[in-house]
Amino acid sequence: MVSKNSKMQATLAVNSVLASLLPGAAAITGSNKKVSKPRVAKAQLIDMNLKKRLELQEKDVYLEKRKEKRARKSTLRKRREEEFEMEQKAKLQILNKHREQGTLTQKEKAYLDELAKRNTKKLKSWDLEDDVKEDFLEIQAQILNDTKESSKRRSSKKKNKNKGFKQTLSSSSKVQDHRYPGLTPGLAPVGLSDEEESSDDE
């Protein structure tokens, strides 16, 4: 049998030859045994498993919290939407009452017009049933007719005011209009000359 010292010397010699001929080549080890990974103790394995389990539990808790948060948000959103719809219905009832009584303010009319425009856009984008469309179009036509009538009344009032103002102007004797046909303001009348005017003055 070959001694350990002679084996070690032989491997050193081979390694030096390899290093001189092939720089960067891997050195040969003296033992034929495979290099095994260091064994992990059982306590370490248990510790690693516990850590993994804790991570998974934390992840599950995080996911559960996220689900709960989403559910809370959705219920809150639904509640807000329901409240908003109730407010809108109440507003519309009040506006209908005002419209029937004829006491709509400018703000309320503008709101109704805006609502009608919005709803027509929705109608165009949605594919509603015929009954719903007919109902909506009737309501819209009614609102538009009411607003047109009120604007006609306003314009007729304005016209009447203007007529009255013009009549008071023409009837008053203080304001007189001295105009001659075919003249530019500031020029003498057609039949008169400057000499005639001066002789009239003297």
UniProtKB/Swiss-Prot annotation:
UniProt keyword list: Nucleus, Transcription, Transcription regulation
A cellular-component GO term for this protein: nucleolus
Subcellular location: Nucleus, Nucleolus
Pfam families: RRT14
UniProt biased composition (Basic residues): 153-164
Lineage summary: Eukaryota, Fungi, Dikarya, Ascomycota, Saccharomycotina
Originating species: Candida glabrata (strain ATCC 2001 / BCRC 20586 / JCM 3761 / NBRC 0622 / NRRL Y-65 / CBS 138) (Yeast)
Chain's role: Involved in ribosome biogenesis, probably through modulation of rDNA transcription.
Protein name: Regulator of rDNA transcription 14
Region (Disordered) location: 145-202
